[in-house]
Structures are given as C-alpha cells and as structure tokens.
Amino acid sequence: LYTILWIFILTLLPYVGFFIYLFFGLTFKKKRVANKIYKIKKLRSRKDVTNSDKKELRRWKGLITYLEMSTDNHISANNNIEPYFTGKEFFENLKKEIKNAREVINMEYFVFKFDNIGKEIADLLIEKAKEGLEVNLIIDGVNTSNFRLKRYFKDTGVNLYFFFKTYIPLFNIRLNYRDHRKLTIIDNKVAFVGGMNIGDEYLGKGKIGYWRDTSVKVFGDVVATFEKEFYFALSIVKNKFLKDEKLPVEPTLKYEEEKSIYMQLISSGPNYEFPVIRDNHIKLIQEAKKSVFIQTPYFVPDDLLLDTLKTAILSGIDVKIMIPNKADHLFIYWVNQYYIADLLRLGANIYRYENGFIHSKTLLIDEEVISVGTCNLDYRSFYLNFEVNLNVYNKEVANAFKVQYYKDIAISKKLTFNDFAKRSIFTKIKESVFRLLSPVL
C-alpha cells in the first residue's frame, strides 16, 4: 500500500510529487544509524537469551526470544505496576514522583505542550534542576511548543533536547521519522509509559472533550530497560556514544521470586530490521486461545495484521476492537471505517467509544498478557515512528485491564454488520480514498 501510494502521487503530480517524496517518502538510512544503535545496545546488556522456562512464561517462550533477539531487551522479574486510565490519575502520580526524585529525571515525549499542566511539569523540573538533580528532557522535533519551551528552560539547569528538530519542516528529510515515545524514568527506580503526552487535553480540557487513555507506572528490574531505551534516544539527539558507566545493565531474571510480575519493554522504529511491535502483536494474536481485546485510536492495520485478526475470528476467538466515535485527526474516522467493515462481516465485535475520545493503545490476550504503550495500530507507528510498548505476563494485571475494558464497553456503541452495510456509496468512496492515504496520515 505504501509503494502504491507513492506511485499514485508521482504519476498524478510528477514534479511536485518528486519533492513530496523527497521529504516524506525516503527510507531511513538504516545501516548507518542502526549500526550505531546496535553498538550502544550491546554495551549495556547480556549476550544470552533468557531461559524462559518458568511455567507462566513457557507459552510465550517463542515471542520472548524473538523480542530479545530483535531488540536486545530482556524479560525481567521482581516488578510491580500501577495502571492509570485517566489523565487525572496519571498526572497526579507523575508530579508526585518528580517531587520525590533524588538523583536524576529522564523524560522523553512526543508532545509537551506549554499549557497549564505543561507549565506545571516544567516548573517542577526546573525546581529539581536547581536542587542539583540531573534533569534530561527529550521532545520530538515537530512539537508545536518547542520554541517557547526552549526559552522557558534557558539557563535553568534542565537539559532540553529535540529529536530530529525541524526548524523548516519542508527542508528536513527526517521529517517523516518521529519520536512518538512517552517515557519518564526517575532515579532508575520508577518509570512511566503509555498513551499520555504532556498537555491539558489529556485531562479532558481540549476541544475534543473527555480523554480516555492508558498509561502505567512500573517499579523493579524492568526500569533498567526503560533507562536503556532513554539513553538510546539521548545518544541520537547528542549524536555521540555514551560512556559505559552511564549505561544501565539489565538484571538477570530471578526465578525464585514466586510472586514476580514478568515484564518486557520492547522498542520499534525505522532503525530496526523488523517492525518489532507489529510482530509482537501478530504473535500474541496467533497464540490466543480465547480472546483478543484491542483498544486503539487509529485502526489502520497492514495486510498481515489484518489477516491475522481474520484468522482469529474464523477460529472462534472472541475478537473485540474499540475505536473512537470521533477523530482527533482529519480523515482518521473514515480510514477506521474502511478496515472494520470486513472484520464486522466475519464476526468481530467492534465498539465505538462514545464518552469523549479514546486514545488508549492496549492489546489484551486471553486475560493473561497485556501489551500497553505508545504504538498505534497503523503504518506510521509500525514502520516510521520510534515507539515503545510494555508486555506484562501476569493474569492479575491482565484482569485489571479486562475490568476496565468492560467499563469502556458500557459507554460504547456496538456496531452491527447489517447497520454498517447500509453506508452510502459516497461514504464508501471516502473510506477507500482516505485508506490510500493512510500510510502518511
């Protein structure tokens, strides 16, 4: 589809299309950047693959091995987790942990708005920097508040970096590759990840209204992997390797901890040979025996993921997909419509969330494994953006997400194929046209 789109643009607009392709279609220079990234990763983690023969992990051994081999991020034990399903919960806990920080605060966000909550977080970071803490903040280069933030943080002690900064967007060939990650790591003891950026809209104060999202706070051995991922991004924005002593080492998996929560942080991006998070989702769905519960604001699966979902439906798996009833970006509503049509016909349970906007990015399998993070189910997240997701292999944690999913169903509208089939020809044309544009949305 991505190739077809560019052929269409270059045929329709041969001269203008060339320049559009130059800035939006060029492939990331994988060899040069990937070699640097892999070199960094090898400096800071074990060479062996985890022996995941623990009873709770045996079923997922193939997936765990693939994720370790492809990302060099190992599964860990001795962890705990707190999920947050509202912006209020998330920001209250984020502010509390920042205030309690004693050594270092590392933050990496796709969006950091200079609004009420953004200024509040910024002031806390400045306060901590003045106390003598190391404070590092990485923000994606297309963030609209970057200029104001740069002025605000000047001479405060906060180390501010922009990921692939774009002073003049149309003259930046890296414009297409964004840091879509949302991470906070404090004192190498606690970390946050999920769908929420820094901004008032995540508190439901934007034009779109109530904002339903999911982020988690984690404690334990897995935090070392969060640190590792952050320093990977820091090495890119600094354009230099980091000294060995700066790089955390992931602890060896300890099987004697009977009540351990097993977690694995996974990363994906144009620097990798494979679309790791997409592969993670496909493997999880293929392993499902009872249920697949998905929440995503953007449902634009590639052919392989779509076929995997179809196979699951036809195999009798309870496939539920929840998408927004309103869109925060132009065209997304119609693209979502295109892809759910076939799944509805085959028997999927599709829900439109009606209490505002749902931005949650979760995949729940058999009430046993939950994958939560920054990755949407679309081409951009799978192939172009830098993303992170956290796999949690624990029934109790998975059950907490299941309970929330059913709460969301209660305020959602279930779609039926008969009603959906009554869409007008004009609506179907819009869906098909916008679907063609989906790789660059």
Model-derived regions: residue spans:
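N-terminal localization/anchoring segments of enzymes in phospholipid and broader phosphate metabolism
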Residues: 1-278, 283, 287, 327, ...
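A short glycine-/small-residue-rich loop at the edge of a beta-strand within enzyme catalytic domains
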Residues: 272, 296, 300, 327-334, ...
